């Protein structure tokens, strides 16, 4: 069970105890009313006995007519004044009875209205209890969400550490790639110089081969001419015997030149083959080194790609978690707004209760002043009653009639007391409902403080992960503000309705009390026992004053709690502003990290581009080598 539920149960038990005390007080009041009725009956019997004694007094008066002759005139005057007083008293009693009947009807109507208001208040209390249960459930869900957020915060801290380590590794790889890039550029320059040298040697070899081809063509042509000449010489051998020796010498010279040229060609060919073999070996060694280097670079690039894909996956996971946390923050914001709305409603209720206490205090002061006036009037009437005791004998019949009227008025008074007791019970019920609302306000404020604390913790965790939360929070704040305004208007309308009902109840109760006190003042002319009712009224006033003091103490406590809640809200606002500044700083840090990551990705792409360019250059060199090998094989075949 939560602390709020325990406090609510204890409050319910206290209210049940108070209800039992009120029932006991009501039983005692009914017993007191029964005792009063018994005393009134006893007084009526005494009045009847006094009537019998008055007849004896009349007989004595007949015997002493001479002695009381002077008093007869006074008695007639007194009878006339008493008859006039009796008429006025009857008129007043009749008017009071009519007013009491009208008041009874009004009280019945007000009772019906009070029942309706009571039912509506009971429904509102049920709604408040339901909202309290919802707040408790929201509190439990917020606690579970807070635990989940703590776990996610720890996991995200681990992921942040991993990302930091990976960023350090990327920076180290970037530095290593930069140095390797410089080395590759230097090697590339050397390779370009070697390629230029090879191109120059190739061009020289090609020119030499062209010269050799031209010389071979010339030699082939000359050989063909020589063969034709030899054929013509063989055909003309017989005719040119004289010239045979010269031609033989020329042929031997030509053979010597051809053999010498063949020897020079073989030497040049062997020399070129040796140079080509050495260059080919150097090229193969360079190709092998470049292949190893390209393999290493490809492995490094593959590792970087895998790392980049892992980073993308981690980024996607973090994005999903940030969205989940955003949804949880939205729900916590809604719960916070709901609790703030309840705190506002409770504050309005406390203000209404304060106004009610002030009005009750004013009414109590008015009742005290009226009570003092009634006591003075009571003393004056008592003196007049003492003056008229001697003339009571002539009013026996009127006393009997007045006794009957007193009985009727007593029954009416008992009905009025019963209705007044019902109204007092209704007022105690309203006070109990007010206490329940006050306890609900206290619980709501405690839940608000707990949810505010959890909301601050969750906000601190979320501010390390997402920078776009401020816009959404502002939108949610606007929606919550509109919801708070509409709810506040509804609560104000309800408060106005309750206030009007209380004002009507107070006005009717005050009017009933005034009329009741006027009836008691009129009945005190005939019955001294009405002073006890006045004493009871004083006791009720004291009890009401004590209740007012209790209400003032309770309202003072409520005001102190409200001020504490306002200070807590101000502290929460300051923390929210501080967290907003931290969010801006974290946003700048995250943007700097994104820029560094993009820069590293650009450098990695540039390195991959350079590796691909080097691969293309190696392929070009390989193709050139193959072409040279083909040319050399063609030359060797020639």
Curated annotation (Swiss-Prot):
GO cellular component: bicellular tight junction; myofibril; myosin complex; myosin filament
Residue ranges of coiled coil: 1-638
Subunit structure: Homodimer.
Signal peptide range in chain numbering: none
Compartment(s) where it occurs, according to its Swiss-Prot or TrEMBL record: Cytoplasm, Myofibril
A molecular-function term among this protein's GO annotations: microtubule binding
Keywords: Coiled coil, Cytoplasm, Motor protein, Muscle protein, Myosin, Thick filament
Family to which the UniProt record says this protein belongs: Belongs to the paramyosin family.
Function: Paramyosin is a major structural component of many thick filaments isolated from invertebrate muscles.
Gene Ontology BP, a term: microtubule cytoskeleton organization
Protein name: Paramyosin
SUPFAM superfamilies the record matches: Myosin rod fragments, Tropomyosin
């Amino acid at each position: 069970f939560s602390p709020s539920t325990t406090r609510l149960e204890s409050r319910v038990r206290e209210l049940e105890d108070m209800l039992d005390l009120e029932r006991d007080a009501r039983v005692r009041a009914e017993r007191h009313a029964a005792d009063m009725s018994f005393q009134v009956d006893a007084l009526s019997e005494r009045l009847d006995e006094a009537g019998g004694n008055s007849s004896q007094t009349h007989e004595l008066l007949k015997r002493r007519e001479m002695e009381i002759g002077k008093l007869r005139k006074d008695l007639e005057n007194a009878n006339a004044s008493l008859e006039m007083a009796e008429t006025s008293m009857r008129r007043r009693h009749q008017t009071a009875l009519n007013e009491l009947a009208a008041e009874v009807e009004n009280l019945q109507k007000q009772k019906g209205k009070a029942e309706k208001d009571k039912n509506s208040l009971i429904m509102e209390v049920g709604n408040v209890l339901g909202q309290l249960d919802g707040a408790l459930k929201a509190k439990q869900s917020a606690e579970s969400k807070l635990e989940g957020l703590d776990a996610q915060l720890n996991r995200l801290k681990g992921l942040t550490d991993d990302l930091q380590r990976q960023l350090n590794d990327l920076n180290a790889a970037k530095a290593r790639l930069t140095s390797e890039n410089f080395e590759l550029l230097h090697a590339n320059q050397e390779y370009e110089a070697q390629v230029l040298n090879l191109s120059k040697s190739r061009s020289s070899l090609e020119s030499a081969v062209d010269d050799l081809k031209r010389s071979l063509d010339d030699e082939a042509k000359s050989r063909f001419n020589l063969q034709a000449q030899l054929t013509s010489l063989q055909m003309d051998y017989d005719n040119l015997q004289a010239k045979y020796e010269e031609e033989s010498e020329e042929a031997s010279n030509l053979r010597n030149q051809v053999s010498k040229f063949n020897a020079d060609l073989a030497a040049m060919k062997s020399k070129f083959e040796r140079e080509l073999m050495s260059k080919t070996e150097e090229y193969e060694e360079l190709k092998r080194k470049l292949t190893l280097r390209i393999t290493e670079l490809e492995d490094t690039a593959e590792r970087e790609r895998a790392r980049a894909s892992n980073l993308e996956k981690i980024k996607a996971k973090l994005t999903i978690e940030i969205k989940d946390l955003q949804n949880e923050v939205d729900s916590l914001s809604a719960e916070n707004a709901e609790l703030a709305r309840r705190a506002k409603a409770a504050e309005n209720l406390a203000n209404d209760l304060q106004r009610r206490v002030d009005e009750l205090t004013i009414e109590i002061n008015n009742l005290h002043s009226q009570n003092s006036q009634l006591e003075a009037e009571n003393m004056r009437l008592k003196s007049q009653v003492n003056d008229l005791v001697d003339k009571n004998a002539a009013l026996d019949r009127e006393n009997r009639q007045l006794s009957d009227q007193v009985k009727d008025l007593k029954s009416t008074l008992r009905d009025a007391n019963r209705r007044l007791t019902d109204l007092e019970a209704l007022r105690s019920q309203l006070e109990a409902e007010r206490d329940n609302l006050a306890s609900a306000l206290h619980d709501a404020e405690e839940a608000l403080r707990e949810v505010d604390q959890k909301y601050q913790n969750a906000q601190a965790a979320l501010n390390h992960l997402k920078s776009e939360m401020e816009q959404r929070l502002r939108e949610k704040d606007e929606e919550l503000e509109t919801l708070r305004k509409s709810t506040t208007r509804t609560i104000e309308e309800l408060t106005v309705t309750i206030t009007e009902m209380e004002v009507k109840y107070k006005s009717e109760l005050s009017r009933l009390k005034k009329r009741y006190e006027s009836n008691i003042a009129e009945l005190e002319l005939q019955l001294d026992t009405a002073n006890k009712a006045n004493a009871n009224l004083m006791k009720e006033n004291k009890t009401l004053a004590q209740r007012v003091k209790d209400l003032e103490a309770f309202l003072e406590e409520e005001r102190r709690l409200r001020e504490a809640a306002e200070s807590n809200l101000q502290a929460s606002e300051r923390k929210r502003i501080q967290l907003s500044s931290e969010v801006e700083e974290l946003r700048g840090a995250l943007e700097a990290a994104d820029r560094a990551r993009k820069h590293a990705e650009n450098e990695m792409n540039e390195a991959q581009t350079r590796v691909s360019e080097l691969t293309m250059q190696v392929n070009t060199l390989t193709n050139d080598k193959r072409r040279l090998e083909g040319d050399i094989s063609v030359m060797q075949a020639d």
